């Protein structure tokens, strides 16, 4: 027991004063070397010290503030040095870290400017490594509480232009990136496209045709037909989604008085 106390004190000193949290290997090596030698309550102490060091570091350095100048590559990719420790930490220590990360994730989404493409990409890079760890229910709740209001507001402010390709529209790109990274559920993505984008598209086409009703053969009308055909072709590449939104897209075709079978 005396030797165990000396050893644990040395390990604690190393963890608190010498360990670089970005390097999980020494801690993993210590765990595998001593977990079968030291009594369980000493291992529990080590777990708490490791967890405490990680949380202290995150508190000081990891705020999800959207300024690239304030972040190092290590900070942006904290999953690279936290995930390897998940298998060796006790449930209590792990819970403390994950609760902290959950809070940071929520804070990051709260302060996220959804219309800023750089911030959006940074957010995706930060969140995507944690999707499997936190589970489907966590992300559903996040969607309802934070993502949904921001997304609806973003689409409400969307300005459509027949000269802008759909694949270049920020909110469309963002929705599919969030879906592909499993940050928002697939069903929510479909609902957003139908209820936010296609409804806006429908309204835009109605107004466009109303303004140009006496000039059907003008270049503007040709432009919108080409533009809309490209929109359909774009959604056809999203196979599962396309089947769900096909009828809604067809409603817009009727507005355009297009007889061609482009859908």
Where do the language-model regions lie?
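Extended alpha-helical scaffold/tether regions of large eukaryotic proteins
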Residues: 1-263
């Amino acid at each position: 027991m005396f030797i165990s106390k000396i050893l644990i004190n040395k390990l604690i000193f190393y963890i608190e004063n010498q360990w670089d949290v970005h390097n999980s290997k020494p801690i993993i090596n210590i765990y595998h070397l001593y977990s079968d030698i030291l009594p369980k309550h000493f291992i529990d102490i080590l777990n708490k010290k490791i967890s405490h060091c990680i949380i202290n570091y995150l508190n000081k350095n990891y705020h999800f503030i959207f300024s690239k100048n304030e972040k190092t590559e290590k900070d942006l990719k904290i999953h690279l040095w936290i995930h390897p420790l998940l298998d060796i930490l006790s449930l209590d220590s792990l819970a403390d870290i994950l609760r902290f990360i959950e809070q940071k994730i929520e804070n990051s989404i709260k302060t996220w400017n959804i219309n800023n493409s750089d911030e959006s990409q940074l957010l995706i890079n930060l969140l995507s490594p944690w999707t499997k760890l936190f589970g489907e229910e966590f992300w559903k709740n996040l969607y309802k509480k934070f993502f949904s209001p921001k997304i609806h507001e973003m689409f409400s402010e969307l300005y459509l232009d027949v000269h802008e390709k759909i694949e270049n529209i920020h909110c469309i790109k963002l929705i599919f990136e969030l879906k592909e990274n499993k940050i928002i559920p697939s069903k929510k993505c479909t609902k957003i496209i139908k209820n936010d984008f296609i409804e806006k598209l429908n309204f835009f086409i109605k107004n466009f045709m109303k303004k140009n009703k006496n000039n059907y053969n003008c270049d503007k009308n040709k432009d919108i037909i080409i533009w809309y055909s490209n929109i359909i072709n774009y959604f056809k590449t999203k196979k599962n989604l396309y089947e769900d939104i096909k009828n809604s897209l067809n409603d817009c075709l009727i507005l355009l008085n297009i007889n061609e079978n482009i859908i």
